Amino acid sequence: MPEEYLNAQKMEKLERIKSRGINPYPATFHPSHTSVQAVALLAELEKQENPPKEILRIAGRIMTLRDMGKISFMDIRDGSGKIQVFCRQNDLDEASIELLKDLDLGDFIGAEGSLMRTRTGEPSLAATKISLLSKSLLPLPEKWHGLQDVEKRYRQRYLDLISNADARQTFLTRSQVISAIRSFMSSKGFLEVETPVLQPEAGGALARPFITHHQALDCDFYMRIALELHLKRLIVGGFDRVYEIGRIFRNEGVSTRHNPEFTMMESYQAYADYKDVMDFLEEMVSSVVKEISGGYTVPFGDTTLDFTPPWPRLSMRDAVKQYAGIDFFDFPTKEALAAEMIRRKLKVDPAKDWGKLVDELVGEFVEPRLIQPTFLTDHPVAMSPLAKQKPEDPRLTERFEAICANMEIANAFSELNDPVEQRARFKEQLEKRNQLRTEESESIDEDFLAALAYGMPPTGGLGVGIDRLVMLLTNHDSIREVILFPALKDREDKGEQE
């Protein structure tokens, strides 16, 4: 950041502070209490007839500053909340009195003193000493309106978090959701593991990968597009229940529901099928919702989402019949289904295969009808190269997606563990993908097929979109609101402060 963007008045104050021999950026300060702890302690002391006069040390950022001559009031905020600091010149040492003159909104201070309640009933710390912990050199966003520019909120998330209590609460909730999922998975006997982000093959999903080059090894790697294939290797290796919460990278479109890097939780359970996983997901999500919100219902936009189990279950074929009026098995080829869609005046991308066209029908007609949590089950084989076929109808797979508020929040299979069938499906999938692309062709993950050939037990696999789940629990309709630093197009004026 060029120095000319720094606030001149704040720079003058900084120099005055330095001239008095004060380090404006000391290495440490040890608070005795957080602001919330201090307020709670005051309430406890007020219950006692003769409470002891305790000396506390608190620290935080100055959010409001009111100078009334010989008395000043400051609201300071730390990670737990805020508390008022009451400064009376008669109670302060000379250095603190001088320092007060050069403090601004945004500065971090440490305050030492005793607890009190003002005449208006405000819990406060009556300060006897003030220490500067960090001098702010740029003005904070205007107090009453906060940070209004949406892109600036995403680009400079630190300002958003300073200004907007709702933003801070969103990311506190996100952390609580992930902690609740980890606790639930542990209670069910799942082992949390870590698998490679850099991979020699881009497998486990139909998505375009990011590619990077490893200088020392002199070879290209892909940023992972799924957690799946390495987790299945661990099932082969003898772990019965494994899961990972990790970042996924897909070099595809950006929207209110898609970010190039996002967080997934994937789990794999030996000796389970997709119906077992359906029950498992239902229990997990409903328990997380209850832990976070206190009940099974949460507001979302103009509606209320109800996660009370059991959730409705609807086959994909029946759903497309019901909402689009098309039985996709009546049109078994790409050409036939495309012709029917064109006849109904629907847009058709000629590059998409039959499975992708079915997916288009689901996105166009089915997902917009599914507001409450619903399981969409039994996808066609063409859409599910890693899932087992249904014995009673081999055109379909043992798969489900959990849909809520018109978007997919989870996806699960009875995992395909026949290495011969898996190779055949990989080949078919690869041929389709390479026909559609002009860049370097992809290849089959031979090591994964080798792992399957050693034997993998019947396994139920699950993937949960953490970002979308957090969207639902924080009442946000954009994924950028729940990712601390979402992907944004580079701006031409980078480095400038508005």
From Swiss-Prot:
Family that this chain belongs to: Belongs to the class-II aminoacyl-tRNA synthetase family.
PANTHER family, per database record: LYSINE--TRNA LIGASE, CHLOROPLASTIC_MITOCHONDRIAL, LYSYL-TRNA SYNTHETASE
Stored InterPro entries: Aa-tRNA-synt_II, aa-tRNA-synth_II, aa-tRNA-synth_II/BPL/LPL, Lys-tRNA-ligase_II, Lys-tRNA-ligase_II_N, Lys-tRNA-synth_II_C, NA-bd_OB-fold, NA-bd_OB_tRNA
Taxonomic placement: Bacteria, Bacillati, Chloroflexota, Dehalococcoidia, Dehalococcoidales
Organism: Dehalococcoides mccartyi (strain ATCC BAA-2266 / KCTC 15142 / 195) (Dehalococcoides ethenogenes (strain 195))
One GO MF term attached to the UniProt entry: magnesium ion binding
Gene: lysS
Oligomer status and interactors: Homodimer.
Catalytic activity: tRNA(Lys) + L-lysine + ATP = L-lysyl-tRNA(Lys) + AMP + diphosphate
Annotated protein name in UniProt: Lysine--tRNA ligase
NCBIfam families referenced in this protein's UniProt entry, alphabetically: lysS_bact (TIGR00499), PRK00484.1 (NF001756)
Cofactor note: Binds 3 Mg(2+) ions per subunit.
Alphabetical list of PROSITE patterns matching this protein: AA_TRNA_LIGASE_II
Any GO BP annotation: lysyl-tRNA aminoacylation
Keywords of the record: Aminoacyl-tRNA synthetase, ATP-binding, Cytoplasm, Ligase, Magnesium, Metal-binding, Nucleotide-binding, Protein biosynthesis
